[in-house]
Amino acid sequence: MAGHSKWANIQHKKARQDAKRGKIFTRLIKEITVAARMGGGDPGANPRLRLALEKAAENNMPKDNVQRAIDKGTGNLEGVEYIELRYEGYGIGGAALMVDCLTDNKTRTVADVRHAFTKNGGNLGTDGCVAFNFVHQGYLVFEPGVDEDELMEAALEAGAEDVVTNDDGSIEVITAPNDWAGVKSALEAAGYKSVDGDVTMRAQNETELSGDDAVKMQKLIDALEDLDDVQDVYTSAVLNLD
């Protein structure tokens, strides 16, 4: 299966994430706490917690911080109880946006999210207005040059759903959300190291933006991601910023 080029967008996204690394620990602690509260403290039986722990390890979070977050989630330590919220809306050129939050104050969060949309040329929509365009899935990206046939065989054997070759030569392995960590581990054991990967909400129909529109859309995404209560921002926009 062929796909269009995502390599430049992936590299740009990683650069933005690195620039915001100071907020990553806070978001990971929230996610670990909620995952442990919802599914228990055993990552072997809790795919959401397993994914959060993978991200914590990738970002070199101290083990004491991780364990404390798990203990707060399971009730072994007292902690804040976070509410999960999802907001939907539209950005530049009608591009769809989904914003996932963890908060202890719903009133504050919706006001902050609405302000970020309004100030940056977007519109906060109603529940379900864009969700139909997104699918929940995991992905792993491998650099151009990896043998596609061998990677495909290893990935499908590990439980992947699909393998996509992009126009730029990078290869993307698609998984079910709960299978992502297992497929990643199996491929690493087989010698395949991904350069990017996550469990995400992926748009089925994308909106290409370039020039000023792309810059404005990036500003809107950044404003949302900068909010303390926001965990993840998903969009149908493909930004051509060069």
Curated annotation (Swiss-Prot):
GO annotation terms (biological process): regulation of DNA-templated transcription
UniProtKB keywords: Cytoplasm, DNA-binding, Transcription, Transcription regulation
GO molecular function: DNA binding
Predominant localisation class: cytoplasm
Compartment(s) of residence: Cytoplasm
Entry GO terms, CC: cytosol
Keyword NADP part of the UniProt annotation: no
Pfam hit, one: Transcrip_reg
Family: Belongs to the TACO1 family.
Protein name: Probable transcriptional regulatory protein NGO_1291
